[in-house]
Amino acid sequence: MHEASIVAGIMRIVEEEAARHDVTRIARVRLRVGLLTGVEPRTLTACFELYSEGTVAEGASLDLETVPALGTCHACGATFDLHRRCFACPTCGNDDITLEGGRELTIAGLEVPQPEGATA
């Protein structure tokens, strides 16, 4: 379960960024997670809930944006979705491809709560 170590790293960054901006509470953490990372969303969310206890992110929501796995064929130039985890070009069948997406795991944003009485 590598999700625990991933969340530990995320929480370190969240705490550092909150301190850097004098923020005492984070309301939402947005992550971009590529399909090829092997990250299990439910496990990641459960680890986040556990690791965020007692931190500036306690009670924060975790929003996950799935990044598709894309490939580009060197033979014909086609760009295609690797959702089947088939690493051959569906246009020409060539397996000389470059992965263009799907390995990302990044913090896309941190949101702070609205101040009491503030309007959106």
UniProtKB/Swiss-Prot annotation:
InterPro entries: Hydgase_Ni_incorp_HypA/HybF_CS, HypA/HybF. Ni(2+) binds at H2. It comes from the Bacteria. The gene is hypA2. Disulfide bonds: none annotated. Belongs to the HypA/HybF family. Transmembrane segments: none annotated. This is Hydrogenase maturation factor HypA 2. Keywords: Metal-binding, Nickel, Zinc. Involved in the maturation of [NiFe] hydrogenases. Required for nickel insertion into the metal center of the hydrogenase. GO terms for biological process: protein maturation; protein modification process. Zn(2+) binds at C73, C76, C89, C92. GO terms for molecular function: nickel cation binding; zinc ion binding. Gene3D superfamilies: 3.30.2320.80. It comes from Nitratidesulfovibrio vulgaris (strain ATCC 29579 / DSM 644 / CCUG 34227 / NCIMB 8303 / VKM B-1760 / Hildenborough).
